[in-house]
Each structure stands twice: as structure tokens, then as C-alpha cells.
Amino acid sequence: MDGTPKLACPWDRTEESLGNVVELQHVNLQVPDQLKATAFYISALGLTRDPYLMTGIDNMWANVGISQFHLPTGPAQVLRGTVGLVLPDRAQLLHRLDRARRWLEGTQYSFTEAEGHIDVTCPWGNRMRCHAPDADRLGRITLGMPYVELDVARGTLPGMARFYEQMIGTSTAMRDGALYVRVAREQFLIFRETDKPQPAFDGHHIQLAFVDFGGIYNRLNERGLISREDSAHQYRFIKVVDPNDGRVLFEVEHEIRSMKHPLFMRPLVNRNAAITNNYYAAGNEAAVWAMPPA
């Protein structure tokens, strides 16, 4: 100690720590009809079909900022919760949603306006909550997937916090009665307790990237939690357990990638959904997914 006084810091430096999880890249949901999926994800929501990968008729990757929906053909899968989206223009979104009724009649498709967001249900029952950009609440995102909220049984949140903190090595916090698990700079998994009976897990998955890819693998593998070995860069697990007693608290497939995975932080093409052939402005075709520096 040289007697030099410590500087007073006006910021909570721990807020900048990401921990071991650095990417929420996609949510994977099977869809039985690619045409209806295009009508919903591309025409109604205004997302962008990936122009380079999965361009055939049996799968679609739909870009939303730095994240994606992966939509392979198969029996419909329904996430037990809500996917949060930030989309740039509420009025234009409502216009697109209204126009999409003609293509999605006879399905579960619906949307409802609320203060601060629009609740949208896909043709097969998946729930989306669409927000306008709001730096104070959702970070500096203008187009993206700030959270995936999952419905869980009563009494499970303390154990789930222990799992993600001790086993996965990321930070958690309780807000408004829900558990927020940080999974990237401005992205969260949110777990909210409910008394409603939940359907059995149907195989849908979320994809995360880990810094300590090998260390977390070893901790999960010691408990027999690894469910699939995909490649040198990727593995999966399904069960979220309480580290204290091993009790299974929730099931959702986690596709885990390393930071050496060839697709890690792959730049994604995002279109400006306001640009059409009838309302065209040269140089404005692309959407900017983040706000400029303050």
C-alpha cells in the first residue's frame, strides 16, 4: 500500500460483466408449413430471411438483429412462454400484422395492442411480445431479441438461479417477480412462475455461446446432464436442475456453442421493412439493429 487514495467510481462495474454466456443467437421452433411461416415471420413481423443459409423449402432462418429464429419443417413446436422482440416502428408493424390476416385465416394467428407493446400469436400458438426501441428498459436495441421468457412451476426460481450461477457461471437477478438470467450484452432468459399446467417439453431449443465451453461441459457432464454431442464446437443439454439436490426444475434444450464455432457472432443481414417497391429510398434498404453511441 503506497497510501494513494482510491478513486471514487460512479458506476457499478459488475453490470458490465457478462460471465460465461455471451450470445443468445437463435430460438428453434419446428413449423409444419413454410408458406405460413414466411407470411408470419417475414411479411407480418417484418423480419429478414437469411439470404445465405437454409434457403430451401424445408427450413428457414429468420434474422432479427443479431439473433434468429430457426424454423425447420416438422410437427409444430410451441415454446412455453414468450419471445420478446424489438421492432422499429409500431404503426408499420400494426399495418403488416393487419395485412397478414388474409394469409393466416383459420390458424391461431392473432395480435393485441397494449400500452408499450403488441402481443402477437403465431399460426401455431407461439407467443411474441413486440416492443418499440427503448434504451432505458431494453438496452440500445432497435431490432432484436432482448429476451426469451419461459413459464415455470412455483417454487423453482431459487434453484434455477443456483443452476445458472453455479453451473453455467452467469449472473441472475430477481425483477418484478421473475428471474432474469443474463445471456449476452443486452439479452436475457427470463423465468416466470405460473400456476397454469404446462405442456410436456416438445423438443424446441435455444442456442447460447459459452466462454468457458469446456469447463461448463465438465460440470454438466459430471451430473449426467449432457444430452447430445454435436461436434467439437457444440453440445446440448435439456434439464435445468437444482445443484443442491439434483431436482429437475425445468426442461428446454440448450444448444451450446463455443466461441470458436464457425457461426459464432456471424454478421446477419437485416432489411428495413419499411422499404418496398412502392415506397423506395435508395441507400435505405438495410436496418440498423443498434442505436448509435450516446
Region annotations inferred by a language model:
Residues 152-157, 161-162, 168-173:
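Solenoidal tandem-repeat scaffolds enriched in leucines and small polar residues
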Residues 37-42, 125, 159-167, 220:
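Conserved active-site tyrosine of GNAT-family acetyltransferases
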Residues 1-20, 22-32, 50-51, 60-67, 72-151, ...:
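Vicinal oxygen chelate
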Residues 58-62, 179-181:
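Minor-groove-contacting beta-hairpin "wing" of winged helix-turn-helix DNA-binding domains
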